[in-house]
Amino acid sequence: MTETPNTSSEEIQTSEPSSDNELQTLQQENANLKAELKEKNDRYLMALAEAENSRKRLQKERTEMMQYAVENALLDFLPPMESMEKALGFASQTSDEVKNWAIGFQMILQQFKQVFEDKGVVEYSSKGELFNPYLHEAVEIEETTDIPEGTILEEFTKGYKIGDRPIRVAKVKVAKFPTKGNNDSNEEKE
């Protein structure tokens, strides 16, 4: 005798749609989980990129703050260093004893200049150059026809820069062509 299963054909037919529904439900759940995983992965990657950008920005800001702190400290040393240079300029007109002292101070001044050089601070000369508002501050203007307009005639304080960026602009006297009104008034006086 052969045994037949107790399931009828109606039961088999009803179980098939049930398994189709289950399959569709599972596929839908799988698709939903994949979408959720992709969304969370995208959010994770975005957060990771934001964290990396923040780290880089903070590092850059820290470097800039250190650079500006060093620049400000160096700027504080410029006036006394320049005063020492001026004083040493007069040492040759004094006694031998003062000249000997001046030699020692000249060595100290050279050490200061070496520190500036090591930090990338460069002194720039302006006399005879064309006025550049990025590098110069015009504190005096002299009207003249002998020298091209915008030429720096005299430098009152030296300029210093690190790389291409000035940390202290040079204070200068600039040549300017006389204005027509000034020539007329000069001619009338003569």
UniProtKB/Swiss-Prot annotation:
Q: Where is the composition biased (Polar residues)?
A: 1-31
What GO biological process terms are annotated to this protein in UniProt?
protein folding
PROSITE patterns, per the entry: GRPE (PS01071)
Q: List locations, semicolon-separated.
A: Cytoplasm
Superkingdom of the organism of origin: Bacteria
Annotated stretches, region: Disordered = 1-34
Q: Which Pfam families match?
A: GrpE (PF01025)
Give the matching SUPFAM superfamilies. Answer: Coiled-coil domain of nucleotide exchange factor GrpE, Head domain of nucleotide exchange factor GrpE
For this UniProt entry, which residues form the secretion signal? none
Gene3D superfamilies to which the protein is assigned, alphabetical: 3.90.20.20, Head domain of nucleotide exchange factor GrpE
Per UniProt, the keywords (alphabetical) are:
Chaperone, Cytoplasm, Stress response
Q: Transmembrane residues, as ranges? A: none
Entry GO terms, CC:
cytoplasm
Q: Which Gene Ontology molecular-function terms are recorded?
A: adenyl-nucleotide exchange factor activity; protein homodimerization activity; protein-folding chaperone binding; unfolded protein binding
- Relate the protein's function as given in its record: Participates actively in the response to hyperosmotic and heat shock by preventing the aggregation of stress-denatured proteins, in association with DnaK and GrpE. It is the nucleotide exchange factor for DnaK and may function as a thermosensor. Unfolded proteins bind initially to DnaJ; upon interaction with the DnaJ-bound protein, DnaK hydrolyzes its bound ATP, resulting in the formation of a stable complex. GrpE releases ADP from DnaK; ATP binding to DnaK triggers the release of the substrate protein, thus completing the reaction cycle.
PANTHER family in the cross-refs: GRPE PROTEIN, GRPE PROTEIN HOMOLOG, MITOCHONDRIAL
Describe, as the record does, how this protein assembles with itself and its partners: Homodimer.
In the record, the note on similarity to other proteins reads: Belongs to the GrpE family.
Name of the protein in question? Protein GrpE
Species per Swiss-Prot/TrEMBL record: Chlamydia muridarum (strain MoPn / Nigg)
Q: Which gene encodes it?
A: grpE
